[in-house]
Amino acid sequence: YFSEYAPHQTAISHFEKSVDTLNENNKAIEKQIADTEKIIKEKAEPLEAKTLEDLKTAVKEAKTSIRKATKMESDTQKIEDQAKEIAKPVDYSETQKNITEKLTAYQNSVKQLAQITNPKDSFIEERLKEVDTIQEVQHATEEHDPNGLLNKQGGYTASIYFSDSQVTEPVYGTDIVDKGTEAGGCIEVYKTKDEAEKRNTYISAFDGGQLNPGSHYVYGTIVIRTSMHLTASQQKSLTEKIYNKLIELK
């Protein structure tokens, strides 16, 4: 009896010890997965949807990679074999690094979208000044607004005009706001993406006509407009420079 009972109990004890060790080794990655899933559940919208998909994939792969303890067999030798298998060293460092990287990318993307979602005029002005060809910057006020849309229903919450060195045609006006988009361009800020899209559609009605509005693109809840005096490639390049400055994380 003893010759069979003792080894069997020892095997069970080995098995349980191995399972405890494994559970201990799994704690860090399981906590990381739980914390990350909590962040995903908050449903914060990123600028690049792919960053969220990549993060979800990383979590899914991490879950699959976790070593699980198998159900204990009844045979003594099999239990010993199981214990050895479960106790083998486990290394999740690559998996954890992958989650960390994907989480950082997603959180940065969320911050980037926030920067172009109804930003303050001071933020826009600060970033515009960092674009190499932009010379002067001035925001519209309710008393001095060529379109008369500032803070009105469906109107913009900020409108920042700028002059650009690539515009060589003379543009008349007492100041940058007065000269309007023609001197370089303008950033119009809206509360919602819908309002920005509506404004963009309205501006599109004048494309190619007598009142050529220049280029206009929606990013987040803002419309980036550039002067009709610029060539198409200059408009595109200037728009990209401005956009990249606005989403740059500091």
Q: What are the roles of these predicted feature ranges?
A:
Residues T95, K120, I124-R127, E195-Y202, ...:
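Stable alpha-helical elements in mature extracytoplasmic
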Residues Y1-N118:
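Amphipathic alpha-helical assembly segments used for oligomerization, scaffolding, or translocation
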Residues E125-G209:
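Short, solvent-exposed recognition patches
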Residues K111-Q115, G184-V189, V223-T231:
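Second-shell loop/turn segments in exported
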Residues N25, Q32-I39, A58, A62-M72, ...:
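Structured segments of extracytoplasmic/periplasmic soluble domains
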Residues E24-K27, K31-A34, K38, E53, ...:
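N-terminal "mature-domain start" segment
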Residues D178-K179, T201-K250:
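A short, solvent-exposed beta-edge/loop patch
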